[in-house]
Each structure stands twice: as C-alpha cells, then as structure tokens.
Curated annotation (Swiss-Prot):
The gene is CDR2. Belongs to the CDR2 family. Residues 44-142, 192-265, 346-380 form a coiled coil. GO terms for cellular component: cytoplasm. This is Cerebellar degeneration-related protein 2.
Length: 454
C-alpha cells in the first residue's frame, strides 16, 4: 500500500515541470556571456603569446648581434697582440742593430785615431828626412865650392898644362870614364828615393783619411736615423699600453652588456640600453628637422586653436609639404644609423609617425568633403571674412603666419565648444613624440651612469 502511494506521488512529481523558463534563460545568457569573455580572454592570451614570441625573437637577434661583437673584439685583440709581438721583435732587432752601429762607430773612431797618429808620425819622419836632405845639400854645396874657386883662378902655368896633357894621354878611354861619371851623377841617392816613397805613402794615407772621414760622416748620419727610428718605436711601444687598456675596457663593457641582457627579462628598449650614445642620430641638428618644427608649432596651437574653414586647403598643403620634407629627413637619418650599425628608436618613431600621418590625411579628406557639401554662399562669406581678417592683420602686422590666419577664420560647421578632430590628433602626435624623447633621455642617462660606474 505504501509502495503504491510512493509510486503515485513519484508519477505526479514527474508530470510537474521541475525547472523555470526564466531561470533557464538567465542561465543561457550567463553561459553566452561566459563564452564571450572566455573567447576575449583567449584572443588576449593569443596576442600576449604572439607578443612574447616576437620579443623572444628580438632577444635572440640581439644575442646573436652581441656574440658577433664579442667575436669581432676577440679578433681585434688577437690582431693587436700580433702587432705588439711584431713591434717587440722589431724593437729588439733595432736595439741589436743600434748596438752593432755603436760598436762599429767606436771601432771606426779608434781606427781614425790610429791613422791620425800614424800620419803624425809620418809627418815627423818627413820633416826629419827633409832636414837631413837639406843638410846633405848644404854639405855637397860646401864641397863643390872649392872646385869652383879653382876654376875661377887665372890660367895655370905651363907645367900644369903639361901634367894635364900627360894624364889625358894615359886615359885612352876617356869617353867611357865620362859616361860612368855622368851615370853616377844621374842615379838618385837612397835618401831621395826614400823621400819619394814617403811622399807617396803620405798621399795614400791622406786619401785613406779622407775616405775614413766620409765613412764617419755617413755612419754618423745612419746613427742619427737609427736613433730617430728607435725613439719612434719607443713611442709606439708606449702607445701599446693605451691600446691594451682600451681593449680591457671594451671587454669589461661586453661583460656588462651580457649581465644586463641576462638580468633584464622584459624587453623594454633593450637595444637602446646596449647601444652607446654615439650610434644614435641626434634629434636636434643644425638644419631644422621635422621634430623641431612640430615642437615649435605646439605653443602656437595651444594659444590659438585651429578651426576648420575655407583656408583648410592652405593648411593641408603646408602640412603635406612639411610632412614630405620631414619624412625624407627621417629616411636619411635611418640610412645613417644603419650605416653606423646602430639600433635606435627612430624606426619606432617613424612607424608611429606614418600611422599618425595616415590618420591626419583621412581627417583632412573628411574636412574637405564637409566643406564641399556646404552651400556656396557660406563658402563665399567665410572667404570674405578671411580676406577682411587678413587685411586687418596686414595693416596691424606686416608679417603673419598661416597658422594664425587659420586660427582667426570662423568655423561654419562645427560649434565653438567641440574641438576639431585634427586638434586631438596633433595632441596625440605631440604626446607620442614627448614620450619617445623622454624614453631616449632616460636610456641615455642610464647608459651614462652604467658607463661611469664601469
């Protein structure tokens, strides 16, 4: 009986609906919202994963770049070491040659002294021999003088003539005797021969002395050149210490760069932290760049807000020419930075600038379309007002800029309370430029502090 009652109650409960339609709708709505949030979260996670992948790739490229730099530094160090070894070898060779030249110069000086002594001895001998010759000549003249006196006497007597005649008869071979006497007189004496021999030796010694003097002069010149080369090589050897110190500094910088790369996991302008200031292209150059023009126009835009009017075409043409010039200058800067093998933030600034330029051109097109859609009368009145205002400004101020004229023109379409869209775009451009400039200054100060600590 109880079982039957329970079965009936269970059947009654099965017939009744156990859920509410409103609750079911709420559950379905919650499930849909949950799925939507999950899908959004999934897309966000995919974006973050993609971003992490790109950062990982950039870090890998940076690591490869640093390894290449380390290899280049090692090669440079090896080359410097080879150069130092060659300089040491050449310095030793020059020292040896210098010592040899010094020894040769000393030997030549000793030889010159010995030759001068021998020359002096020979000169004394010559003087002595000349004195002896003069004495002999004087003695010979003293012997010949009595014979001459006899010849100068008057003619001998008859007895003397007879004796002479008898002597001539005894000497049959008179001509032979005369020849012997003449030959004896013609033969030089041994003193004269010795004198001539000594004169010849003196001339030879004088020639040798002149040659030795010439050799000495040449040796002194060579000695001076060797001393100069030795001093230059000593200076080069002194400069090798500076080269070694520079190589050690570069190795320390590379080690610090590696530590920074390992310590900093988030990739926030890592390239700017690792590249020195010399590889950056300065924003402020002697020629007025695009960034300077944009910074100079900031206070004017804040003083007098720009409004859309009939002079918008003038503004667009001026802005277009400025944009083209600025884009060319940025391209030139990028080429210079690539040539210097430096990685800078100009690429990011250029991409931001190109995106903002596209937005600005779209806004200008919209403004021109809205102006074309206006009535012809409104355009004429706005142009007349612009001409009147320009005339007044010309009378008061002879020179007026295009930006000030555009700011004075009335706005026919938009209300004065709502600012135009390109004004917000300019604000965004200036904020981006200021932000990038602040980041660059921070990175430079950080790098300078690191280099000063190192």
């Amino acid at each position: 009986m109880l079982a039957e009652n329970l079965v009936e109650e269970f059947e009654m409960k099965e017939d009744e609906p156990w859920y509410d339609h409103q609750d079911l709708q709420q559950d379905l709505q919650l499930a849909a919202e949950l799925g939507k949030t999950l899908l959004d979260r999934n897309t966000e996670l995919e974006d973050s994963v993609q971003q992490m992948y790109t950062t990982n790739q950039e870090q890998l490229q940076e690591i490869e770049y640093l390894t290449k730099q380390v290899e280049l530094l090692r090669q440079m160090n090896e080359q410097h070491a080879k150069v130092y070894e060659q300089l040491d070898v050449t310095a030793r060779e020059l020292e040896e040659t210098n010592q040899k030249l010094v020894a040769d110069s000393k030997a030549s000086q000793q030889k010159i002294l010995s030759l001068t002594e021998t020359i002096e001895c020979l000169q004394t001998n010559i003087d002595h021999l000349q004195s002896q010759v003069e004495e002999l000549k004087s003695s010979g003249q003293g012997r010949r003088s009595p014979g001459k006196c006899d010849q100068e006497k008057p003619a001998p007597s008859f007895a003397c003539l007879k004796e002479l005649y008898d002597l001539r008869q005894h000497f049959v071979y008179d001509h032979v005797f005369a020849e012997k006497i003449t030959s004896l007189q013609g033969q030089p004496s041994p003193d004269e021969e010795e004198n001539e021999h000594l004169k010849k030796t003196v001339t030879m010694l004088q020639a040798q002395l002149s040659l030795e003097r010439q050799k000495r002069v040449t040796m002194e010149e060579e000695y001076g050149l060797v001393l100069k080369e030795n001093s230059e090589l000593e200076q080069q050897l002194g400069a090798t210490g500076a080269y070694r110190a520079r190589a050690l500094e570069l190795e320390a910088e590379v080690a610090e760069m590696r530590q920074m790369l390992q310590s900093e996991h988030p990739f926030v302008n890592g390239v700017e932290k690792l590249v020195p200031d010399s590889l950056y292209v300065p924003f402020k150059e002697p020629s007025q760049s695009l960034l300077e023009e944009m910074f100079l126009t900031v206070p004017e835009s804040h003083r007098k807000p720009l409004k859309r009017s009939s002079s918008e075409t003038i503004l667009s043409s001026l802005a277009g020419s400025d944009i083209v010039k600025g884009h060319e200058e940025t391209c030139i800067r990028r080429a210079k930075a690539v040539k210097q093998r430096g990685i800078s933030l100009l690429h990011e600034v250029d991409t931001q600038y190109s995106a903002l330029k596209v937005k600005y051109e779209e806004l200008l097109k919209k403004c021109q379309e809205e102006q074309d859609s206006l009535s012809h009368k409104a355009v004429q009145t706005s142009r007349a007002a612009a001409k009147d205002l320009t005339g007044v400004n010309a009378q008061s101020e002879p020179v007026a800029s295009g930006w000030e004229l555009a700011s004075v023109n009335p706005e026919p379409v938009s209300s004065p309370t709502t600012p135009p869209e390109y004004k917000a775009l300019f604000k965004e451009i200036f904020s981006c430029i200021k932000k990038t400039k602040q980041e660059i200054d921070e990175q430079r100060t950080k790098y300078r502090s690191l280099s000063s600590h190192s």
